[in-house]
Amino acid sequence: MPDRTAAPSYPFVYLASQSPRRRELLDQLGVRYALLAPTPDEDAEALEAELPGEAPDHYVLRVCVAKAEAARARLVASGKPAAPVLVADTTVTLDGAILGKPADAADALAMLARLAGRTHDVLTALAVIDATGELMPPALSRSAVRFAPATRDALARYVETGEPFGKAGAYAIQGRAAEFVERIDGSHSGIMGLPLFEAAALLRAAHVAF
């Protein structure tokens, strides 16, 4: 195992995500980053497939680590300078079921109808592979979100905005879905997709300077 006490520091991290929210959150921390997006020949969606009977926390951690390993391989193949790689993955769970990204408007509306008037969990996993290629112990942020009761018409109007698409659980807490959020217990940044407390700890352990 590398001696981290003697490791050099790195002025930036590779962010393997296309999420503008995660970029904004890294900006909030003052972390410099370079994007490391999947190449056109990579099947990123295949990594998100659920295994039969898989628990939500196991699922999100497994997917996050798989994405981190794919990103590290992409970095090595690119010949770019060595630096740590950061990956995050978020899922929503209700009654033990995983609510991923909606397939279409009907799917989004069905998800939101399930969440209305209920408390669900938002799980965000973080994985960092350091500059030597070692996977650091992943982190998991768990937050509870309470949705107020909402009419089907109100939910349908929200779906029509297009905001639910590409979002786990079919909503973005930092967007117009805030009108449905009665309360949260946990990490607001984690619900957005990058828990900053855990991210800062992992990045400092990987010797990212910020």
Swiss-Prot record:
The keyword Transport does not apply. Its EC number is 3.6.1.9. It catalyses: dTTP + H2O = dTMP + diphosphate + H(+); UTP + H2O = UMP + diphosphate + H(+). Keywords: Cytoplasm, Hydrolase, Nucleotide metabolism. The active site is at D89. Transmembrane segments: none annotated. Its cofactor is a divalent metal cation. SUPFAM superfamilies: ITPase-like (SSF52972). GO terms for cellular component: cytoplasm. The record marks R21, T90, Q174 as: Important for substrate specificity. It is found in: Cytoplasm. Nucleoside triphosphate pyrophosphatase that hydrolyzes dTTP and UTP. May have a dual role in cell division arrest and in preventing the incorporation of modified nucleotides into cellular nucleic acids. This is dTTP/UTP pyrophosphatase. It comes from Burkholderia thailandensis (strain ATCC 700388 / DSM 13276 / CCUG 48851 / CIP 106301 / E264). The lineage of its organism: Bacteria, Pseudomonadati, Pseudomonadota, Betaproteobacteria, Burkholderiales.
